[in-house]
Each structure stands twice: as structure tokens, then as C-alpha cells.
Amino acid sequence: LRAFLVCVLFVVMFATPHSSQAVDETITIGVLTSISDEWAVMGTATVRGVELAIAEVNGRGGVHGRKLQLLVEDTREAHSGGHAVTAYRSLRQRNVKWLIGPAGTGAAIALAPIAAADQVIVISPTIGVSEFSSAGANIFNVRGVDRHATEYMAREAFKAGWRRVAVLASQQPWDTAQGEAFASEFTRLGGVVVSRESPLSDANDFQTMLVRALATKPDGMFLSHFSRIGVIGKQLKRLGYTGPKFSTLLDPAAVESASGSLDGTEFANFAGPRGSFISTFQATYNVEPGLGSDTAYDAVLALAKALDESEDEGVATVSKKLSTVSFDGAAGVVTFDRDRIAVRQVKRFIVRHGRIEESRPAE
């Protein structure tokens, strides 16, 4: 009898499906974004977009019957990309391989080569440079490339009669890239950059730089400092500057912090959130959708769709499927080009009475 019981126990242990290598009952989505520094508003919006997408996917049964769950790591990347690598490794130690993020260019540059060599898929909802996704076939950019919008604004400035421009772009990599793009396109058209200022990304006093820039008597100013644009607007106003101001990206929170000093500022950006996403977000969080919320939502839906349609969960298989997805998302129709960058329409915006309003479709 004892021999029989031992035999039965042996059979049960080794015949039980997935006994020691059970398929996880949930699929973990890791989020890498800033939630405790100057980019916390964008980071919070990103996390909330992911939460709404996870709720939607789980509400319709999950992926192959498995529910999605969320893990968030704070990248604190407003001034440095180094923390993003630490956050990434923390998620990887917990075997998370489906990742949304990081938030900005510095982290993207630091993280892309590491992720490209790893068994993960990374989709950023807020990075606006092409260098990120070009690092590997498993890296995706659902935001688009901001350079196109910046170059468009340079053409619009020249068309409006600007021939002399002052450029202020911080040393944060994304800010710097936009300043370079604007200056390059403006000079290509025949304009002259009469002043170029490059403050530190965490600077708060811009008066000396602004006085120096205004002394060159520019026809207009191009401002690229995502985390301090509101401060710059206030200081320009105190100096009596009333001329035109162009930028490439303004966040509603930054505009609000500027206390009206950014009124009249024009910029080009991708189309914002639309449809039922706006009402659902407002009903859930009692605030308007912020930068990154809609694209984070779309990133999760794109990943869930790719997972659902893939024959297995190998990174190569899912990456290939993800590159072909197409659906109507919160930020518009989601499709990727051959470099795994979302194809998105650029629109022109203006700040009026402390609020961002759509001006007209861009080219």
C-alpha cells in the first residue's frame, strides 16, 4: 500500500499541468515614469492612462483570460536619465518584460541600448525623438517625433516675417534637440539666430540670459524648456517683453503656473486626447487628461492587442505583431512606421486666457 501511495503521489506531482513552471495568472505591465519630481504631473497622467487601459482590457476578459496588473517605478528623470536605468533593473528583477516608458529623452538615451539587448518590449508614450526606437526592434514610440513639429514652427516663424530669432533651450536633451531643430530649419530658410541661451535644466533664474537675448532685438523668441517654461514666461513679462513667443510643447500645468504670462505663445504638437477617453478620464480622476495620458492608454491597448493576436509570448513574436497593429485610440489612429514610431498628425496651438486652444491643423 505504501508503495502504491508513493507511486500515486509521484504521478500527481509530475502529471499536474505547469506544476513548477505555471503560466502566471496575470500579465504584469511595468511603468517607468517620473512621479516625484518636476515631471510628476506628466508621470501621474501617464500612470492614470495606463490604469484606464488596464481596466478596459480586464473588463473584457483580459488577454487570453489573463488579467493585466500594474507595477510602477519612479524614474525621477527631469534632470537625469540615470534613475531610469535603476528603475528598469528593479522591474526586470521581478521578471517584468512588458514596459511602458520612460518619460524623456535623457532616460531614453540611457535605457534604449540596455533594453534593446534584453528580452523585453518597451513602449514610450512621451518620448519625442527617433533615436529611442531605432535602438532595437523591441522598442516602440507611440508619441511620435517632436522634431517635425518644431521644424514646422520654424517655417511658420519665417512665414510670419521673422528674420531674427532668439533661441532659449535648456541643457536637458529633449529641450536641446528642439532648440537645435528650430535653429537649423530657421537658418536653412535664410533667418538668423541672433541669440542662443542654454540654461541648466534645473535653473530658476533666467533674467541675465533673457536680458542678453532681448538686447539683440529679435523678431521673436523660441523657448524650449519643458519643466521651467512657466518661470521663463513670468520673467519675460517682468522684463516688459511683448513680442511673439513660439515653442514646441506646452503642458496645461505649466501654462497654469505661468499666471497668464504665456498667453499668446504658439506651438505645434500632436493632436490631444479625444472622444470618450476624455469623459472617462475626467469622471475617474476629476481632472482633464494631461500630457501622456492618452498615449499611455494607447500604448497598453496596442500591447494587449499584440499579445492577444500573437501565437506565443516571445518578445520577437509580440514585437513583430505590435509593429502591425492598427486601431482607433485615445490619441487618434494608432499605427507604427517602419522605425516603430507612431504616425500622428501635427496641429498648431495657442495659449489664450491661460488655456491651450487648437489654432489650426499644421501641414
For every predicted segment, state its role.
Residues 4-10, 16-363:
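Extracytosolic ligand-binding ectodomains
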